[in-house]
Amino acid sequence: LLSAATAARAQFMSAELMGGSALNVPTPLSIQQAGFPDIHFTAHYDTKPFGPYAPYYTWRVDFWNKKHDRAWEVQQVHHRVFLTNTTPEVTAFAIHFGYNYLLAGRAWRMHGFMLHTDFGIIVPNPANTVRGLSINIGPNAVDTGYGLSGVGGQIAVSRQFNLAKHFYVLADGGFMMGRTTVPVVNGSATVPNVSFHGRVGIGVEF
């Protein structure tokens, strides 16, 4: 019992909450809508990390081994994308209620840094107006809610700076890729995303 208790104390978990922003690489956007030709073009997105609506954020929980050099982790990234090169047919297109990554993976401590690799699912909630028909925009728009409709992953590097015992601040940089399908009125849109993320936040160790 004593050895089991000692082993339990040797292991610990950390929890982190961060804000930040992302640089989105231009990616193809494809829209299929019943009764109309398909739409294909290269989409440019802004993150607008501070609003409108819920800002960009991420949280991460790590479960470290006894040596404190490897961990299993879970993470949510509340990413946001707003189309900036709208067209006469696509007058608004955003996933600002969340291009949400729900991820699980591994972390390693190396030379004072933490390396993270994670994979998981995407749960988006879109807002768009295509050919005058709107989802989640305006008082008469269709509200679709959240739905599981994609997969993605990330590679990230973080660095901690201790504030006090058990508390620290951190900086984190990540590269993320994902692909999801979201509804438009009478159709759907395929929305891949490739993005570079910068984050800062606070953490606590238990």
Show which residues each predicted segment covers.
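Flexible, solvent-exposed loop segments that connect beta-strands
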Residues: 27-47, 79-97, 125-147, 180-192
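Gram-negative (and chloroplast) outer-membrane scaffold detector with strong preference
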Residues: 58-140, 150-153, 161-166, 203-205
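Short glycine/proline- and aromatic-enriched beta-strand/turn motifs that initiate or cap beta-hairpins
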Residues: 9-68, 203-205
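Transmembrane beta-barrel strands of outer-membrane/channel proteins
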Residues: 15-21, 74-78, 117-123, 171-177
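Residues that define the transmembrane beta-barrel architecture of outer-membrane proteins
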Residues: 11, 53-57, 96-102, 147-153, ...
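Predominantly the C-terminal beta-signal and adjacent terminal strand-loop region
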Residues: 27-29, 39, 45, 158-206
